[in-house]
């Protein structure tokens, strides 16, 4: 019989988490979706993460089945800028204290109740922590009551990982075939369990929100509004994006780019290149409590710009509205371990340009436009090919939504249960 959520207890270890303070990219979104989906499936789920210093240390959600353990709050009070400010101090506290709490407060009570615990740890910050958990479990005589799993979302921090020790005490997983092949080069063979998106993202984007944003931008055929949401990182191919806008404008298409990044320094280089290409760069901010109305007003104020640098935090529902309002979404990374933004944009029914590395969900000209090069002309050429063929664009958008549904968290949880059932039965780790 395949493992069921009701028969297991899950403990998820991750630096990022669902708090705004703890969200720095796709990892926080992944963990929020994963843990909520596990709890909704009936599993008692504990999440240990670096949480907001202003929120409760322990919080119950989903009818008490999801328990949030906000860690290192006393340190976070000195670092108000987010989860990675004061990173090493927080990491030291995480490594030194979480394993003991996990064993005493989660594994031991579960074992006494006859339930098996699955410890799911994410990325390099938790590699040493998981090894310590294994040692403490052995010392407590509880090692066989827990299955340890370490998941790699990307190669960041791989140089810090003791692969021999980690591979000995835990089962390794990753999020795409690209990452599996990458890790082969390190002598590891992880099991692939795909990422997921909240099922709520599959709800149709409100037509009034799409209309408000497009009206604010003065959007309309034949001049496209393109959207790119990513960290300001060279791997995300921001330069390719602004160069594609310049190429389209050079061919007579008045393309514009809404750029939503983070606080990374690569931003300055990208915007300077845009200016050198003759593009007008503007800035928009939807406010501390963004809404459709405030976002529309901010975009309207910058509508004359060719590149609009959208600053500040946007909740998921506004990002989905932005994807739905766009004529195209550029998820054109050169190195993408999975590509969560591309999948989220697909859920909104967007016309998505993806890269060709870890985006296992993307199928060329079936549900996305898959870019094989770093040539901005490839984006421009695809755009020109689609003009006069609204049937192709409509087919891609419909197929994109269907694909996104296959990666909703409830569907991914089913895959996860099958994989964990095998790992627990075969490896004994």
Language-model-derived ranges and their functions:
Residues 137, 267-317:
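Nucleotide-activated donor-binding/catalytic signature segment of Leloir-type glycosyltransferases, i.e.
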Residues 320-326:
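Short alpha-helical donor nucleotide-sugar binding micro-motif in glycosyltransferases
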Residues 218-236, 242-245, 258-260:
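Conserved donor-binding/catalytic core segment of Leloir-type glycosyltransferases
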Residues 334:
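Aromatic "clamp/platform" in nucleotide-sugar-dependent glycosyltransferases that forms part
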Residues 347-355:
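Short hydrophobic beta-strand element within catalytic cores of glycosyltransferases
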Residues 2-9, 37-117, 287-307:
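A conserved catalytic-core segment of Leloir-type glycosyltransferases
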Residues 369-376, 385-390:
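Conserved acidic donor-binding segment of nucleotide-sugar-dependent glycosyltransferases
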């Amino acid at each position: 019989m395949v493992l069921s959520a009701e028969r297991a207890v899950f403990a998820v270890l991750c630096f990022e988490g669902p708090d705004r303070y703890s969200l720095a990219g796709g990892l926080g979104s992944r963990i929020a979706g994963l843990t909520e989906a596990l709890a909704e499936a009936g599993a008692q789920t504990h999440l240990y993460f670096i949480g907001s210093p202003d929120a409760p240390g322990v919080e119950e959600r989903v009818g008490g089945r999801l328990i949030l353990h906000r860690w290192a709050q006393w340190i976070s009070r000195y670092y108000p800028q987010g989860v990675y400010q004061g990173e090493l101090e927080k990491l030291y506290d995480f490594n030194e204290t979480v394993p003991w709490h996990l064993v005493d407060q989660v594994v031991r009570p579960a074992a006494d109740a006859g339930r098996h615990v699955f410890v799911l740890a994410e990325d390099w910050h938790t590699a040493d922590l998981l090894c310590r958990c294994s040692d403490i479990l052995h010392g407590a005589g509880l090692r066989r009551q827990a299955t340890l799993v370490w998941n790699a979302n990307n190669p960041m921090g791989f140089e810090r990982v003791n692969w021999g020790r980690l591979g000995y005490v835990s089962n390794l997983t990753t999020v795409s075939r690209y990452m599996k092949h990458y890790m082969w080069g390190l002598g590891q063979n992880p099991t692939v369990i795909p990422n997921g998106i909240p099922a709520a993202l599959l709800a149709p984007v409100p037509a009034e929100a799409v209309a408000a944003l497009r009206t604010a931008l003065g959007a309309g055929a034949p001049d496209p509004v393109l959207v790119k949401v990513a960290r300001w990182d060279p791997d995300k191919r921001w330069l390719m994006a602004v160069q594609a806008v310049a190429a389209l404008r050079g061919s007579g298409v008045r393309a514009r780019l809404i750029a939503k990044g983070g606080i990374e320094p690569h931003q300055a280089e990208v915007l300077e290149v845009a200016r050198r290409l003759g593009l007008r760069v503007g800035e928009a901010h939807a406010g501390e409590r963004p809404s459709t109305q405030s976002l529309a007003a901010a975009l309207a104020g910058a509508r004359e710009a060719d590149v609009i640098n959208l600053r500040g935090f946007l909740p998921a529902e506004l990002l989905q509205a932005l994807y739905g309002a766009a004529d195209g979404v550029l998820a054109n990374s050169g190195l993408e371990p999975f590509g969560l933004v591309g999948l989220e944009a697909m859920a909104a029914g967007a016309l998505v340009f993806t890269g060709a590395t870890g985006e296992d969900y993307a199928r060329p000209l079936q549900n996305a436009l898959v870019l094989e090069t770093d040539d901005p002309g490839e984006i421009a050429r695809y755009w020109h090919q689609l003009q006069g063929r609204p049937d192709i664009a409509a087919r891609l958008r419909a197929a994109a939504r269907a694909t996104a549904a296959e990666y909703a968290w409830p569907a991914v949880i089913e895959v996860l249960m099958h994989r964990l059932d095998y790992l627990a039965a075969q490896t004994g780790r």
